[in-house]
Amino acid sequence: MNAAPRDLLRQFLDSFTDIAVIPVRLTPVLSRYYDAIAKDPELSKLALEKCNYVLENLSAHSPEIVTRCSRLYEALTAAKERDAAGNLIVEHINLESVSDMPFLSRDQHMANLIIEEIDVADYIEESPS
């Protein structure tokens, strides 16, 4: 699906909790709409309000509607996390040029690895019979 028109997404958002309008058999393809809504800040806010209402009142809604809202909520939070990750500044540092810390090769790192073998039977208490 290419970018859905905003008015279509709004109409979808208004009716996606109505199984008579969007039947259960269409549930597998709804994730495309969820992703498109997550990209629009205004629609995301409306969707979040609607999903929070449904998820706070689980007993008042069918399991299908709760599942739809859960998946939409996941799409919204994932999009928010992706946006937050875009603000990260990644800096690569070449540790070979640092003078106060010697560069350790892979073998030197492995030399610091301590492996111990323990007998689990020493730590298991026998139950009194």
Swiss-Prot record:
List the GO terms this entry assigns under cellular component, sorted alphabetically. Answer: nucleolus
Which keywords annotate this record?
A: Nucleus
Lineage: superkingdom: Eukaryota
Q: A Pfam family for this UniProt protein?
A: Swm2
Glycoprotein as a keyword?
no
Annotated InterPro entries: Swm2
Q: What is its main location?
A: nucleus
Q: Where in the cell is it found?
A: Nucleus, Nucleolus
Q: Which family does it belong to?
A: Belongs to the SWM2 family.
According to UniProt, the name of this protein is Nucleolar protein SWM2
